Every structure is written in structure tokens, then in C-alpha cells.
Regions:
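Short alpha-helical transmembrane segments in multi-pass integral membrane proteins
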Residues: 1-21, 75-142, 188-244, 300-366, ...
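Transmembrane helical elements of multi-pass membrane transporters/channels
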Residues: 16-35, 136, 170, 203-207, ...
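Transmembrane alpha-helix boundary and packing residues in multipass membrane permease domains
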Residues: 21, 25, 36-37, 54, ...
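Helix-terminus/linker motif at the lipid-water interface of multi-pass membrane proteins
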Residues: 26, 30-48, 117-124, 180-191, ...
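Small-residue-rich hydrophobic transmembrane alpha-helices
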Residues: 47-110, 144-163, 261, 274-338, ...
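Short runs within selected transmembrane alpha-helices of multi-pass transporters and secretion channels
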Residues: 68, 137-156, 163-174, 196-212, ...
Length: 449
């Protein structure tokens, strides 16, 4: 009877957390879909330029994700322990860090957009469109970090549904404004890439306003001004111990992952366009593993923080098994969606052929992505075991994938699909190493004081 009750609780918790988080991630990914299809419907170069320009926000998110991951790891454990004072302190610390990061990226994008675009492409037309986008979108980068902190607090405090609702409303507003500003409507002239940037900015303002408003409802954690200017040395040290390795891993992974777009950008506009569409489809399908990963981190973290180490370990083992099933489902979704996307997207014949080949590579990539995301980000992260991600990425991505892609792009003139496959090999090659580390159970740890 005890086993049945345990299974029921596990499944109920998993679905309660996974579905709203997956919906939230899906809604966020749909913004990229809207940008790609609406801009791509006007001009392939619009789509490619925005895809490259948003790599700047991707880099910003590496820093923000380190702060919010520290908030999620410690927050989930202290919520399990029901220590609200510690939660307030951690929340304020994350807000301070995200605020500094947001200002730095705003300045870079607002005042030096052309230099940033030159990192990703040498095509003048893509650079010009990207600069137009960044000059407006840079203002939204001021707000993103604050919103993410509020969203994470909702997730770990049993309000994942509210977080999903906020994201859904924001995305719907973004998509509607995209249609109005990109194409032109209600007396507004077509703004193409500038319209996409303006829609993003307005939706970010709405997202932050909704997040702050919900935080004042009973049962929610809100930012307390006095905590914003106070400092708990012990919690700050714990936060840095969790976030430091995550930031290192984010930089190792994020800079490497961004370089993948650089390789495609330097292989011509057709390759860049195919990569833009493939990235959008990949991100949508990966919402499934991201949802399970986030749910795993919260569920296991709650148990570990409450002192239930045995149950937390059992949850982790089940999540590891689930990661393979999730990967198989994602592979099927990739294979099924490929012909549908190819039918609707507007590309040159060469870009369409490239895209077909990239989809084939991604079908195999999904297994590795699922296993590593759920086990490393979810299970390992729940107990503060955050170092593995950084050094495994340093070896598989920077030691194998990137050197191969650099050689193929700049020296050996390999076909686009071969270079793209090189950028995906790290996720597959890392699986055995991840499973060996999992069996050491270093992640079964109570981090609370």
C-alpha cells in the first residue's frame, strides 16, 4: 500500500509541476515561432537577422539563468523546509544580481549593436537588420531578469500554474502585437524587424507588471524592499556556491552554443535561414524535457530540503529513467514535425534542402538532450551538485564538438549538414559520463541551514 501511495504522490507532483512549466516554456518558444514565420513570410533575411540578433539575449540569459538557478535550487529546499525568511533573502539577492546583468546588456545592445552583430555574421544585409532590431529590443533586456526571478519564485512556491498563466498572457500579447507591427495594421505602417522588437518590449513590460501584481496575493512570495538592501552572509555564500558553477557551465555551454550559430552564419544566408528554423523547432520540442527537468529540480529539492533524503534519491532514480522515455518521445516528435514545417515555411530551395538534413540530425540529438537536461539540470541541480555540468561541457563541447565544427567551417569546407552534426555530437557523447556520475549520488544532499 505504501508503494502505491508513493507512486501516486510522485505522479501527481510531476504532472502538477511539469505541465504548467512545459506550457510556459512552450509559450515562450512560440514567440520565436511567430517571429520566424511572420518575418520569414516577408523576407528570409529578416528572419535570419533576428535569429542572429537574439543570440545576444541568449548570452544574457546565461548570466540570468545562473542567478535564477541558484534561486531555484536553494528556494526549492527552503520551501520544503518552510523557511520563508531565508526565501525572502535569496529572492532579494537574485534580484540584485539580475539587475546588474540587465543594465550591462542594455548598454551593450543600445550603444554598440553593430559591433555585436559582426560577431555573428559578415553579411551586410543581416547586420543592418540586426542593428535595427537590437536598438529597440535592448530596452526589454532591462526587464527580463526581474521577471524571471518572480516566475521562478512562483514555481518553487507551488504556483507553477500562475507562472504559466503569466507567460501565456505575455506571449499572446507578443504574437498579436507582432502581427500588427510587423505587417502593419490599424493605421500603423509595416515595421518588419523593428516591429518584432517593439512587440517584445511591450510584452516584457506586461509580464513584469503581472508578476509583481500576483506576488502580492496571499500565499505568494513578494520582494521586500528592506531585504533588497540587506545581506545574509551565510545564504550569500551558499547562493554563490550553487550559482558559481552554474554560471561557469552556462558560459562554457552558452558561448559554445552561440558559436554554432556563427558557424551557420558564415556558411551563407541559406544555411543561416535553415538553422534559424531548425533552432525554433528544436526549442519547441525541447520544452518537454525542460518541463520535466524543472519539475525534477523542484520535487527532489523539496524532499531533500525537508530532510527526506531517501525519498529524494528515489525520485531522482525515477527521473533518470523517465529521461530516456522523454528522449524517445522527442525523437518521434522531431520526425513527425519535419515534413509539416517544410511544407509551411517559406525558404529558398537550397535552404529547404539544408533544413531537411538538419532535421535528420536533430532526431538523433533529442535523446542526448533529454537525458542530459533532466539528469544534469534537474536531478544533479536539486542537491547542489552543479560542478559536473561545467567540466563535462568543457570536455565534450570545447574539446570535441567545437574544434570539429571550426575545422569543417573554416578550413575543410565540409557540407552544412556535417558541420551541424559536429555541433550536436557533444550531447550524445556525454550520456555515459552523465550516468556514471549519477550513480555516485553526490546530488543527494540537504543544503539548508
Amino acid at each position: 500500500m505504501k508503494t502505491i501511495e508513493f507512486d501516486t504522490n510522485f505522479d501527481k507532483k510531476l504532472w502538477t509541476l511539469m505541465v504548467p512549466i512545459m506550457v510556459q516554456n512552450l509559450m515562450l518558444a512560440l514567440v520565436a515561432v511567430a517571429d520566424a514565420f511572420m518575418l520569414g513570410g516577408l523576407d528570409q533575411n529578416y528572419m535570419s537577422a533576428v535569429s542572429l540578433a537574439t543570440q545576444i539575449q541568449f548570452i544574457q540569459n546565461m548570466f540570468l539563468s545562473a542567478a535564477t538557478a541558484g534561486l531555484a535550487i536553494l528556494g526549492a529546499q527552503y520551501w520544503g523546509k518552510q523557511d520563508i525568511k531565508a526565501l525572502d533573502d535569496i529572492f532579494a539577492l537574485a534580484i540584485r544580481i539580475c539587475g546588474i546583468v540587465s543594465v550591462l546588456f542594455f548598454v551593450a545592445c543600445a550603444f554598440f549593436p553593430r559591433y555585436l552583430m559582426l560577431i555573428f555574421t559578415n553579411e551586410p544585409v543581416l547586420i543592418d537588420y540586426g542593428v535595427s532590431y537590437l536598438k529597440i529590443a535592448s530596452f526589454s533586456y532591462l526587464l527580463t531578469g526581474f521577471s524571471q526571478c518572480y516566475i521562478v519564485m512562483m514555481k518553487i512556491s507551488e504556483h507553477a500554474g500562475t507562472a504559466a498563466a503569466v507567460s501565456s498572457i505575455t506571449v499572446l500579447i507578443n504574437i498579436m502585437l507582432n502581427a500588427i507591427f510587423i505587417y502593419g495594421a490599424f493605421g500603423i505602417e509595416s515595421m518588419n524587424v523593428r516591429g518584432a522588437a517593439l512587440a517584445t518590449l511591450i510584452s516584457r513590460v506586461v509580464e513584469l507588471m503581472l508578476s509583481i501584481t500576483f506576488s502580492y496575493r496571499p500565499g505568494y512570495i513578494r520582494l521586500k524592499i528592506r531585504e533588497l538592501f540587506a545581506r545574509n552572509k551565510e545564504l550569500s555564500a551558499d547562493f554563490m556556491r550553487c550559482s558559481g558553477p552554474i554560471l561557469g557551465a552556462s558560459l562554457v555551454w552558452g558561448i559554445g552554443f552561440t558559436s554554432y550559430s556563427t558557424f551557420m552564419g558564415h556558411m551563407g544566408t541559406d544555411a543561416a535561414a535553415a538553422n534559424s528554423v531548425a533552432a525554433v523547432v528544436r526549442d519547441i520540442i525541447c520544452c518537454l524535457s525542460a518541463g520535466i527537468s524543472s519539475a525534477a529540480g523542484i520535487m527532489i529539492g523539496n524532499e531533500l530540503g525537508a530532510g527526506n533524503l531517501k525519498r529524494g534519491k528515489a525520485y531522482g532514480i525515477r527521473m533518470a529513467k523517465l529521461s530516456f522515455l522523454c528522449g524517445a518521445v522527442m525523437t518521434v516528435l522531431m520526425a513527425v514535425s519535419a515534413p509539416v514545417i517544410l511544407h509551411f515555411v517559406k525558404l529558398t530551395p537550397q535552404a529547404a534542402e539544408y533544413l531537411k538534413q538538419l532535421f535528420g540530425v536533430l532526431a538523433f540529438y533529442m535523446i542526448g538532450r533529454s537525458v542530459n537536461e533532466i539528469i544534469i539540470n534537474g536531478v544533479f541541480g536539486s542537491g547542489g551538485d552543479t560542478m559536473f555540468d561545467m567540466y563535462s561541457l568543457a570536455v565534450t563541447m570545447w574539446g570535441i564538438a567545437i574544434p570539429l565544427a571550426v575545422a569543417g567551417t573554416y578550413f575543410l569546407n565540409w557540407p552544412v549538414v556535417v558541420v551541424y552534426a559536429c555541433t550536436c555530437v557533444d550531447e550524445i557523447g556525454k550520456i555515459p559520463w552523465t550516468l556514471i556520475h549519477f550513480k555516485k549520488y553526490k546530488w543527494v544532499k540537504d543544503l539548508t541551514r
